[in-house]
């Protein structure tokens, strides 16, 4: 039996899967950081460029400061950033020198482990990103094979990609990334040996979501196949569309004869903290999912499906949902089987909706579909169906989008901002709206303390003080007394 290590995804992927990436702010993360550091995880999946953008937009917090503070609060556990290569916050392909600066600043602020994936499986782009990361000081690069189900994504397809990764001197590990939770234990038993046969002694990891209930079983199968690193989430940030529960998976791994060297007490404390936080903030807890065979066909993530249903409801076309879902399968095949992770589910679903609603298929084509076809998101894994490609490229709008200038080089971008601006602030301003970064800067340093147990009381006091007839508020408990009085008599 194997010695298994764990990567915790609660703060980044678990948060994003269940709480829409906005559920945790800097103070809430810092409060649990020392406990997470004690658990003994191999790494913490901490952030992504998308996550950094969300911090600026929604909580008006400096994502660079968040990384630095977390690094100081949890010095013993590597922090991971997941990247899709030559993109930072924006989905536009960035200049290589720009990305080099991004990686340099991430390392300087405290990121040491980088998970590099390319949803199109463009290995040249992925491996070039790995090279830049290493040259800028990244300690560990984990190259991802993004799993999906289609006519072209067979075991040999992944094995060939893995062989290319294994030849690189800039990759320390390889992981099978199953963002939609499609990988069954049965498929794992053929896929993992096929990949392992082509990578020599390169360590493997498995990252499998629980979207249709498969993740925990797939992780157990992977451990039996001698995969030594599994990705998990904690407490309410596990299950649902997130990843397997760390607590339950550890119990099951040990029951199967594997060893997992973690601090169980610290893990229990972390689970309790996130549970209290979820209760205080009104955030949902992930629950085990039932198996849904239809999901294997359309692969539309839950959040995207909810949006699609709402759009049809607003149009009073709720009965069209089955037709749109069926069209999603057809469009995905015609576009070369893009893996259904952001932004591709949105792109495929938008086209499917237009095809069902319009006078004929592809009579309307959104800009993002055109950008996909002309390679703005990278080279499609499989060729776009020729008749569809010809029809899209013949549109005047396609010619306009093809004429769009590429992202400016770093030196040109730098000239647009003051010379004394820090690299960290420059990188945000180069890719985000000015008003959003201005608001973040104006907000000042992030709050660093948080207690979920006092949040309901604070909210109650805040609401009571708004009442015009409240003259005095009192709070008493053991060794504590608080009195708040109005400064003038109530009207």
Regions found by a protein language model. Name each.
Residues 1-22, 74-91, 138-149, 194-203:
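N-terminal small/glycine-rich loop or linker at the start of catalytic domains
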Residues 3-46, 54-55:
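Conserved N-terminal beta1-alpha1 strand-loop-helix module at the mouth
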Residues 6, 14, 36, 116, ...:
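Conserved, mostly hydrophobic/aromatic
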Residues 34, 43, 47-163, 171-174, ...:
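Active-site beta->alpha loop and helix N-cap motifs at the rims of alpha/beta catalytic domains
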Residues 37-38, 43-55, 288-295, 299, ...:
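Terminal or standalone catalytic/regulatory effector modules within metabolic enzymes
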Residues 40, 110-112, 137-139, 167-172, ...:
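Glycine-enriched alpha-helix->loop->beta-strand junction motifs that scaffold or abut catalytic
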Residues 98, 153-165, 212-227:
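Catalytic cores of alpha/beta
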Residues 179-363:
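Catalytic alpha/beta core domains of metabolic enzymes, predominantly
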